[in-house]
């Protein structure tokens, strides 16, 4: 074997070794895990992310609840297209055929016992329309409201006063002004609510990593 060939083989071996030791391990999802989608290119997605930043500096605009069934992994969530519904994991990871970054979080051990009841509550909310006003409601739900309510009986997550103001300017972005003008209601500034970035910042959760 020539010296040059030996160098090539050594390089390939070291490259493979480095890749194996530094790649993120495959995540095995469990029922009760939360999947957070990073913001998309849609205006509302960007607007949600912009006004809901936390100290964790996450950029999430959607969240869903994992359930592992006998036939596969599904995600229970509320979205504008289908309201409160159940979709396959693949459909959640590739909305409208696109690929988005999805980060998995898991409840810490002390809170794992709340999951069965939360899954049951989530199923009871199936079929309700999407809550486009983002004002808490019993008849319609937005994504983080859906997750909050699923765990509400065990007080896993908490509500915070909502803000729709740009933290850099203190003013309402044009996107939100136009959004609520079309709905014919005032911007619900200060009303209790929740958002994906706020849920992800909970000290009851631990980050698992990116779903491949």
For every predicted segment, state its role.
Residues 1-27:
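Bacterial Sec-dependent N-terminal signal peptides
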Residues 20-212:
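Cysteine-nucleophile amide-bond enzymes
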């Amino acid at each position: 074997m020539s010296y040059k060939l030996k160098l090539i083989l050594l390089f390939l071996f070291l490259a493979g070794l480095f890749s194996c030791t530094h790649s993120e391990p495959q995540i095995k999802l469990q029922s009760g895990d939360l999947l957070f989608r990073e913001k998309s290119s849609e205006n509302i997605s960007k607007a949600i992310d912009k006004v809901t930043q936390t100290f964790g500096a996450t950029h999430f605009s959607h969240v869903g609840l994992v359930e592992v069934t006998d036939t596969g992994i599904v995600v229970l969530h509320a979205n504008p297209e289908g309201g409160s519904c159940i979709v396959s994991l693949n459909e959640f990871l590739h909305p409208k055929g696109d690929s988005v970054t999805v980060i998995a979080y898991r409840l810490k051990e002390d809170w794992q016992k709340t999951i069965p009841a939360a899954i049951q509550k989530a199923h009871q909310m199936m079929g309700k329309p999407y809550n486009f006003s983002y004002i808490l409601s019993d008849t319609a739900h937005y994504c983080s409201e859906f997750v909050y309510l699923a765990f509400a009986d065990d007080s896993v997550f908490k509500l915070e006063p909502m803000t729709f103001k740009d933290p850099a300017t203190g003013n309402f972005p044009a996107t939100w002004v136009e959004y609520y003008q079309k709905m014919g209601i005032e911007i619900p500034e200060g009303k209790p609510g929740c958002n994906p970035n706020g849920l992800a910042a909970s000290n009851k959760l631990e980050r698992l990593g990116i779903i491949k």
